Amino acid sequence: MAKQKIRIRLKAYEHRILDQSADKIVETAKRTGAQISGPIPLPTERTIYTVIRSPHKFKKSREQFEMRTHKRLIDIVDPTPKTVDSLMKLDLPSGVDIEIKL
């Protein structure tokens, strides 16, 4: 029988909140007896918006805004039913996007 694996991808704009959430997931999975790989930092996605400062004139005067999306990857190898239940009950901050694949 092939080993079952749960892959969790986390995304957030704040890296501190993201790391705290990843630590909670790793701690919960280790406590329930599953093997963990990660958290693996993935490349940070940068989105830059350039806006003209003036409403009418002076096109050369511009302002740039940047939005960074930080990402982490956690693999849970051979999870137990207790691991899955505890991960479902886990309370994470609202600023973290979670994508789970079985």
Curated annotation (Swiss-Prot):
Signal peptide feature range: none
Its keywords, alphabetically, are: Ribonucleoprotein, Ribosomal protein
Q: Which InterPro entries match?
A: Ribosomal_uS10 (IPR001848), Ribosomal_uS10_CS (IPR018268), Ribosomal_uS10_dom (IPR027486), Ribosomal_uS10_dom_sf (IPR036838)
Its Gene Ontology biological processes? Answer: translation
Organism domain of life: Bacteria
Asked if the record carries the keyword RNA-binding, the reply is no
Cellular component, GO annotation: ribonucleoprotein complex; ribosome
Q: Name one Pfam family in it.
A: Ribosomal_S10
Q: What does this protein do?
A: Involved in the binding of tRNA to the ribosomes.
Q: How does it assemble?
A: Part of the 30S ribosomal subunit.
Entry-linked NCBIfam families: PRK00596.1, rpsJ_bact
Listed name of the protein: Small ribosomal subunit protein uS10
Q: Which organism is it from?
A: Limosilactobacillus reuteri (strain DSM 20016)
